[in-house]
């Protein structure tokens, strides 16, 4: 780095003395073109484009007929008139002899020969004239020659010529320039050859300068402003500014400094230094990059200008104390006059400083005119510099976003390798921020096995007992350090050094200054940007300085946090490559890297935890598979048992019941179904494997009240009956029959006695695992688990294609038992049936048919005989009531009616609704298509009548359930016949008109004074008037229910007295002229002792009295 004070003034190229006057003294060529000094470097300017287009035009014409230089000049004049702007390096036509704008035809017809043309050029021009005349006489032949016989090279050049005829636009932020920046290195901008190479333009530089010197001051000023107005390459722009300022002020050389740093630590960086009008852009950029000059604000001439924002004009540099003559002494160049001026943006902030040295026109100092021109031109240059910086920032931001996107992609690509991920992040950070070293410290996160076991044995809803690593306000620094200990260190050195991973010891961490700084950041959670490490360590007594910081100048250290804002590591950058401190922009970029590093570390740890959990799951599945599989003794016993015929189990009948079958008989019945369908031999199922699988399936059903193994057996038997008796096997393949029977047996595996809604409400693991058809998906997974268990795969002999097919059938069939799926598929099935569909072999139609068959089998208990059906219904209701109790207890919510134990009397009514909504429509449409399963439909109709009759009796006030559980059928209530009912007072009301007429004379009354419940209709009502138990009232209701059926009462009610209350008669006025519409009211009281009248009523009299009332 060049000394700061030496950079304040002076020059470095003795060979490039003030010699531009020699070139300026040469005579100017007449008609020098108006052009910009951009020809010093071939950038994206009109000058370069015009030069290239002129060459393209000349090449295109020459390829056709050997065009001369005169044609090229005429074409250039045509371009100039079209674009209305100067083009270099061709001189314009003298003003005294204006030439009209040539047309394309005139180029070929022109035969004039201007002075200076050679004889060969004259001959070429004659050839052009001859060809032009031929083209004019026979244009069709020329067109045909172009389209059929013209060489491809000629056509290509001609196309380029035509394209070049279009007017040029002013240069802007073209895609080429943007792509040039995109392909540049993140740390060192790689300039394109067009920007850095000015070899082609250097040869035309004297002509450009001579042309510009021929302009008046106003035209020159505007031309130079146009030259820099749209330039976005900061290096090219600065070079243009210095060259143009030299032309405007006749300065020998100049330097341009750009302001950098934070608001509290600003400095100047020499973008280009000692640039003369002959200095090539590439040389200037190379020299500035090789020896970067940094000048703090307030130091030297340029530093003072930046500090004060005031211009400095020095007439004799050696007499000014701020001037440093060391560079002059090294180079032999003598600095006389210096003019240094600030460059500000639109807000008035310093963005740079421009400095010019020595006059070349014989003057010894810069006068006021030079100062004014310099100030005016730098005003416009400030706008251009800020635009170029904004563009550079946008490009850098784009590069940064691309790097961050790559890092995001790397997080998922390297999630199984933390070392590779962190190394990649550090490499990207080092290259983008241009630093020497990069380190990442990882904090111990208590991932040891002991803490894991502590976590497992923690009780639910209990505070965490493990020591926390949270930093408390009252903790000392040492206590905070003890809570954050680094366990892994990633280090990345220079560009050619490989990354290293180590596990530092406590001694190494306590003796390393860099580690202590990282420990400080992890403890405080603050970002540290250290410009001077030695000074920072002196200010923090708790950190000890070691010898390793001798080579460390600047450090940027930042915490890495996870989603819970807990520090999991520290990222550290050491020393910028150019020796300057880290800026706020660097900290902002590094923050993004720290965030991605935290995401990567967190994601990797999550991935490792997931892998561990998967391993634990495999172990658990192995254990579960072992315990879920039937024992070898049970398998051997079932294998040796004799299997009865299907008729002995009544498997062909739709009235099958399992009540009389023992558990072993249920397994034998399943085996008989497989044997009867010829599945064992058809698919080569080993008999012992089939027996073990059946026993394992039975073992994996929970002992719930309804959805247990026997329910699965009934569903499978109904499917067997539909296939055999219902003759539906003709629509199925053997593989589909196998899948359907397996699905029926497994469709409720591991049922917990609760439905999908309960799983969702309680947010159970099953609901998290399966968002739709929760239990059905679990049943299928259990089915797969059993099949995958050793010795249970009954599909082992199937081909891969058949295996996939049968598993698809099993999955679809089990999921179809979800009534939500039934309602989705029902309309499509009904539409097919209504359209007279008879071909069910299509994949979608077969899936619909199997789904409807599964639902029909699942609810087939509704079609069983009444003595079976009402028992099963009570089991279902009891299971539902248990779920309702759980909802009240766990969720503190009121369950729906069918699960509310308090509304159990509504069960008959709900059964009727279930039959009407689901069962009857399904069986009706199936019977229409497959008439052999009509018994299912007829049985459902019969049970509906029974449930409807029971529902009507419940509406009359009869209670059909007399206790909390409903495992007893209605008929079993007869066992209470010998019990005596005591202390019952009830009222019986009837609207029998004949009886009303008979008793009206004695108890007649006005209808308006009759209670409404006595006028509401012919019904029997029970009303509790004392401390009467619920069981007693239920028994009485049952007795009356039997009496209403005409059967003999089974309970001997000892009615001791029947009388009419005198109080009621007194309060009910009667009128002989009006009929008694309210009915007769009788109050009867039963007591164990004799009544007040001493009259005892026996059972037969009681029955006669009730019958007469009813």
From Swiss-Prot:
Keywords: Cell membrane, cGMP, Hydrolase, Lipoprotein, Membrane, Metal-binding, Methylation, Prenylation, Repeat. Binds 2 divalent metal cations per subunit. Site 1 may preferentially bind zinc ions, while site 2 has a preference for magnesium and/or manganese ions. Its EC number is 3.1.4.35. The modification Cysteine methyl ester is found at residue 1107. The keyword Lipoprotein applies. A lipid is attached at residue 1107 (S-farnesyl cysteine). It is an enzyme of class 3 (hydrolase). It is found in: Cell membrane. The active site is at residue 707. Residues 233-385, 417-601 form the GAF domain. One of its GO terms (molecular function) is metal ion binding. Residues 1-25, 35-55, 192-203, 1082-1097 have a biased composition (Low complexity). Residues 1108-1110 form a propeptide. A divalent metal cation 2 binds at residue 748. One of its GO terms (cellular component) is plasma membrane. Residues 1-55, 67-128, 184-203, 997-1028, 1040-1110 are annotated as: Disordered. A divalent metal cation 1 binds at residues 711, 747-748, 858. Residues 631-954 form the PDEase domain. Interacts with PrBP. Belongs to the cyclic nucleotide phosphodiesterase family. Has a role regulating cGMP transport in Malpighian tubule principal cells. This is cGMP-specific 3',5'-cyclic phosphodiesterase. It comes from Drosophila pseudoobscura pseudoobscura (Fruit fly).
């Amino acid at each position: 780095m060049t000394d700061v004070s030496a950079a304040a003034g002076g020059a470095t190229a003795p060979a490039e003395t003030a010699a531009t006057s020699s070139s300026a003294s040469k005579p100017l060529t007449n008609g020098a073109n108006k052009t910009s000094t951009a020809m010093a470097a071939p950038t994206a300017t009109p000058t370069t484009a015009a030069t290239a287009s002129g060459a393209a035009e000349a090449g295109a014409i020459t390829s056709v007929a050997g065009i001369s230089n005169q044609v090229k000049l005429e074409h250039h004049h045509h371009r100039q008139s079209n674009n209305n702007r100067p083009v270099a390096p061709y001189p314009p036509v003298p003003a005294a002899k204006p030439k009209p704008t040539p047309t394309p035809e005139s180029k070929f017809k022109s035969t004039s020969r201007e002075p200076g043309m050679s004889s060969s050029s004259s001959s070429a021009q004659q050839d052009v004239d001859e060809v032009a005349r031929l083209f004019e006489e026979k244009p069709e032949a020329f067109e045909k020659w172009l389209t059929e016989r013209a060489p491809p090279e000629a056509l290509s050049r001609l196309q380029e010529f035509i394209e070049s005829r279009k007017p040029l636009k002013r240069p802007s932020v073209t895609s080429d320039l943007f792509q040039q920046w995109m392909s540049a290195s993140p740390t060192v901008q790689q300039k394109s050859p067009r920007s850095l190479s000015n070899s082609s333009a250097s040869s035309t530089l004297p002509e450009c300068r001579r042309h510009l010197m021929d302009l008046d001051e106003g035209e020159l000023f505007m031309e130079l402003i146009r030259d820099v107005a749209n330039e976005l390459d900061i290096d090219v722009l600065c070079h243009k500014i210095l060259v143009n300022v030299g032309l405007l002020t006749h300065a020998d050389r100049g330097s341009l400094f750009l302001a950098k740093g934070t608001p509290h630590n600003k400095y100047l960086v020499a973008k280009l230094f000692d640039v003369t009008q002959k200095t090539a852009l590439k040389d200037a950029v190379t020299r500035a990059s090789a020896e970067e000059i940094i000048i703090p604000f307030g130091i030297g001439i340029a530093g003072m200008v930046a500090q004060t924002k005031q211009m400095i004009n020095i007439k004799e540099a050696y007499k000014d104390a701020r001037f440093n003559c060391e560079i002059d002494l090294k180079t032999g160049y003598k600095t006389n006059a210096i003019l240094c001026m600030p460059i500000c943006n639109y807000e008035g902030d310093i963005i740079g400083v421009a400095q010019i040295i020595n006059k070349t026109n014989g003057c010894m100092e810069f006068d006021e005119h030079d100062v004014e021109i310099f100030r005016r031109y730098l005003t416009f240059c400030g706008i251009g510099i800020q635009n170029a910086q904004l563009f550079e920032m946008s490009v850098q931001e784009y590069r940064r976003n691309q790097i961050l996107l790559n890092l995001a992609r790397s997080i998922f690509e390297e999630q199984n390798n933390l070392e590779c991920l962190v190394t990649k992040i550090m490499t990207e950070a080092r290259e983008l921020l241009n630093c020497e070293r990069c380190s990442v410290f990882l904090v111990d996160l208590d991932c040891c096995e002991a803490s894991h076991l502590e976590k497992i044995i923690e009780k639910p809803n209990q505070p965490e007992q493990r020591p926390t690593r949270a930093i408390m306000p009252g903790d000392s620094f040492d206590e905070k350090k003890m809570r954050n200990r680094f366990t892994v260190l990633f280090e990345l050195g220079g560009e050619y050094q490989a990354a290293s991973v180590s596990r530092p010891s406590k001694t190494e961490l306590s003796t390393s200054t860099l580690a202590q700084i990282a420990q400080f950041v992890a403890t405080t959670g603050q970002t540290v940007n250290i410009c001077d490490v030695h000074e920072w360590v002196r200010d923090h007594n708790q950190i000890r300085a070691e010898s390793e910081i001798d080579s460390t100048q600047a450090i940027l250290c930042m915490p890495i946090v996870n989603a819970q804002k807990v520090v999991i590591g520290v990222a550290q950058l050491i020393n910028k490559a150019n020796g300057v401190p880290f800026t706020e922009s660097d900290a902002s970029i590094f923050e993004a890297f720290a965030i991605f590093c935290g995401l990567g570390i967190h994601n990797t740890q999550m991935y490792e935890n997931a892998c561990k959990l998967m391993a634990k799951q495999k172990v658990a599945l192995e254990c579960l598979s072992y315990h879920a599989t039937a024992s070898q003794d049970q398998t051997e016993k079932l294998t040796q048992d004799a299997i009865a015929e299907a008729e002995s189990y009544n498997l062909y009948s739709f009235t099958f019941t399992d009540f009389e079958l023992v558990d072993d008989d249920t397994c034998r019945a399943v085996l008989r179904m497989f044997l009867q369908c010829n599945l064992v031999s058809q698919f080569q199922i080993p008999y012992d494997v089939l027996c073990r699988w059946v026993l394992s399936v039975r073992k994996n059903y929970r002992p719930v009240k309804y959805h247990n193994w026997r329910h699965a057996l009934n569903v499978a038997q109904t499917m067997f009956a539909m296939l055999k008796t219902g003759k539906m096997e003709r629509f199925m393949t053997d593989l589909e029959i196998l899948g359907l029977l397996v699905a029926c047996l497994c469709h409720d595996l591991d049922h917990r006695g609760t439905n999908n809604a309960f799983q969702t409400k309680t947010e159970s693991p099953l609901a998290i695992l399966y968002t739709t058809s929760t239990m059905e998906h679990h049943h299928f997974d259990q089915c797969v688990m059993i099949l995958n268990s050793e010795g249970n795969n009954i599909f082992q002999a199937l081909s891969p294609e058949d295996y996939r097919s049968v598993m698809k059938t099993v999955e679809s069939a089990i999921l179809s038992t979800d009534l939500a799926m039934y309602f989705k598929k029902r309309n499509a099935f009904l539409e097919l049936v209504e359209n007279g569909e008879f071909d069910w072999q299509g994949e979608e139609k077969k899936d619909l048919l199997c789904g409807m068959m599964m639902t029909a089998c699942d609810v087939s208990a509704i079609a069983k005989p009444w003595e079976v059906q009402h028992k099963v219904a009570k089991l279902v209701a009891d299971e539902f009531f248990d779920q309702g109790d759980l909802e009240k207890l766990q969720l503190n919510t009121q369950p729906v009616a069918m699960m509310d134990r308090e509304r159990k009397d509504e069960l008959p009514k709900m059964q009727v609704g279930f039959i009407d909504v689901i069962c009857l429509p399904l069986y009706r449409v199936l019977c229409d298509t497959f008439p052999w399963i009509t018994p299912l439909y007829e049985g459902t109709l019969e049970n509906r009548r029974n449930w409807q009759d029971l529902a009507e009796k419940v509406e009359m006030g009869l209670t059909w359930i007399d206790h909390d559980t409903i495992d007893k059928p209605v008929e079993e209530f007869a066992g209470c016949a010998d019990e005596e009912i005591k202390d019952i007072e009830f009222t019986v009301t009837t609207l029998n008109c004949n009886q009303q007429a008979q008793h009206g004379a004695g108890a007649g009354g006005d209808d308006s004074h009759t209670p409404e419940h006595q006028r509401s209709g012919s019904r029997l009502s029970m009303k509790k008037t004392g401390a009467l138990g619920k069981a007693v009232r239920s028994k009485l209701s049952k007795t009356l229910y039997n009496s209403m059926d005409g059967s003999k009462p089974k309970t001997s009610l000892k009615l001791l007295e029947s009388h009419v209350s005198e109080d009621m008669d007194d309060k009910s006025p009667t009128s002989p002229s009006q009929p008694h519409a309210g009915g007769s009211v009788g109050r009867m009281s039963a007591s164990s002792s004799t009544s007040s009248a001493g009259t005892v009523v026996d059972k037969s009299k009681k029955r006669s009295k009730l019958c007469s009332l009813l």
